[in-house]
């Protein structure tokens, strides 16, 4: 059981490291997506 806990800790640490690398990219992609959606909405409203 102790070995399992150790493995879990190591897994969580590496997972956190991956998250730290991925999160900023995901946040940037999310912002870009939100902006393009907002732009599309604005264009649609102008066309009406």
From Swiss-Prot:
Which molecular function term from Gene Ontology is one that the record holds?
Answer: toxin activity
Q: What is its main location?
A: secreted
**GO BP: any one term:** killing of cells of another organism
The protein's superkingdom reads Eukaryota
Q: Where is the signal peptide?
A: none
Protein name as it appears in the record: M-oxotoxin-Ot1b
Family recorded in the similarity comment:
Belongs to the cationic peptide 02 (oxyopinin-2) family.
Which keywords annotate this record?
A: Antibiotic, Antimicrobial, Cytolysis, Hemolysis, Membrane, Secreted, Target cell membrane, Target membrane, Toxin
Keyword Coiled coil (UniProt)? no
GO terms for cellular component? extracellular region; membrane; other organism cell membrane
Q: What does this protein do?
A: Disrupts cell membranes, particularly those rich in phosphocholine, through formation of pores. Has antimicrobial activity, hemolytic activity and insecticidal activity.
Q: Which organism is it from?
A: Oxyopes takobius
Disulfide bond positions: none
Localization in the cell: Secreted; Target cell membrane
């Amino acid at each position: 059981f102790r070995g399992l806990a150790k493995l879990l800790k190591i897994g969580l640490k590496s997972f956190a490291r991956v998250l730290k690398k991925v999160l900023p990219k995901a946040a940037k992609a999310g912002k870009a997506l939100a902006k393009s959606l907002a732009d599309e909405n604005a264009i649609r409203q102008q066309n009406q």
